[in-house]
Amino acid sequence: MMMLPEACIANILAFTSPADAFSSSEVSSVFRLAGDSDFVWEKFLPSDYKSLISQSTDHHWNISSKKEIYRCLCDSLLIDNARKLFKINKFSGKISYVLSARDISITHSDHASYWSWSNVSDSRFSESAELIITDRLEIEGKIQTRVLSANTRYGAYLIVKVTKGAYGLDLVPAETSIKSKNGQISKSATYLCCLDEKKQQMKRLFYGNREERMAMTVEAVGGDGKRREPKCRDDGWMEIELGEFETREGEDDEVNMTLTEVKGYQLKGGILIDGIEVRPKT
């Protein structure tokens, strides 16, 4: 193997993974040269990477090396007038997207009495949406599978924060769903905020009968018997899993990702929406 010419090694590396190509430099100088070649990294770049770069709003693209382009895409890229965030996993090459709050459908989000829009310091997007008051929470995002990695199981996650003055978010679980035109369906339910035990005791005292009735309508308990709630992210936000779906080679499908809470009829507010992330499941 050590006696193989550089071009032959590059051909072999192109059929491995980005992780293997990154580590090849540790083998020998010939492997390092082969592992840095444009031929290898062209294989790992998304087929539409030039289009993605042309849509970029936060990079100056004067890089000639395909490996460096790959590294930049791993750092994430704002595209589509900064309404979407594109990213590839450094070691697997799998594609992820984040659809901003402006790029998804939020019922009544254009009415200032229901929602307010503002810049949030730890968001990559220029605006996030904060719920002021509503009795019907309906959120929907759409994505085409052709822009994602083929033959991959994906999860969709609503990125949120709950403000200190939030109310009405923990009385009734929200319903989540994933639907695609090819027939994939994933349905579940989750609470919109983490449940505080003291607040739960007060809620049961005042709303016990109503809560029992609603629990019969919307179940928000996972297979492990635990309540489904938002989970903390590394970026300071929280995420609510909406469901999962699979992509297939050569297939172009539209996936609808939704969260609704319309059965409780109670007023609610104080949840901040940053967008929906679509990423490969580990």
UniProtKB/Swiss-Prot annotation:
The lineage of its organism: Eukaryota, Viridiplantae, Streptophyta, Embryophyta, Tracheophyta. GO terms for molecular function: carbohydrate binding. Component of SCF(VBF) E3 ubiquitin ligase complex that interacts with VIP1. Interacts directly with SKP1A and VIP1. Forms a complex composed of VIP1, VBF and Agrobacterium virE2. Coiled coil: none annotated. Residues 1-44 form the F-box domain. InterPro entries: F-box-like_dom_sf, F-box_dom, PP2-like. It comes from Arabidopsis thaliana. SUPFAM superfamilies: F-box domain. Component of SCF(VBF) E3 ubiquitin ligase complexes, which mediate the ubiquitination and subsequent proteasomal degradation of target proteins such as VIP1 and Agrobacterium virE2, after their implication in T-DNA translocation to the host nucleus (can functionally replace Agrobacterium VirF). Required during Agrobacterium-induced tumor formation. Disruption phenotype: Impaired Agrobacterium-mediated tumor formation. The keyword Cell membrane does not apply. Keywords: Crown gall tumor, Ubl conjugation pathway. This is F-box protein VBF. The gene is VBF.
